[in-house]
């Protein structure tokens, strides 16, 4: 049995220490280097470790933004336990419930759950999505007949970068139908891809 892994993954050496901090309910000072912006120290109450797309993420309460955030382990440059600060426990349900409305790990709290409808023009893509849905809410609305009579599917999620990335894999064989703001954002990304590659 083989599992997908990334042997060159940076930051996994922090996994054990972060897991122990979660179990021990310890407050951490994390040295974090975001993809955009300067490296900084963040006071963090760790709750959960999650893997997505061969990458590990630490979920917890970020004191700076007063909200739950996730930090990619490969961007954590170091951490230490902070004494004298009371640990703030997670007050929600289980983490399966927390992530149920998203593809991946990014939850944009200001973005509501939406029904994304799309057409599938290719039989291989249609069959692939039926047997390997990218989210548990993916539903078939109309079966595939031909490229002229495509399938219609829908997924009920909070739109985020990971959803767009998954749909871009199939961009040559699908058409986003609704909602229009998501459709326009998706089209803008496709136009940018074309501009970069012409």
Q: In which residue ranges do the predicted regions lie?
A:
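Well-ordered beta-strand positions
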Residues: 50-51, 168
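Bulky hydrophobic/aromatic content
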Residues: 1-33
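Polybasic (Lys/Arg-rich)
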Residues: 100-198
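Short, surface-exposed charged micro-motifs
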Residues: 46-48
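Short acidic/polar, Gly/Pro-enriched loop/turn segments located at secondary-structure boundaries
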Residues: 35-37
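Short aromatic-glycine-enriched beta-strand elements
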Residues: 55-59
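Flexible linker/loop signature enriched in Pro/Ser/Thr and Pro/Gly
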Residues: 65-98
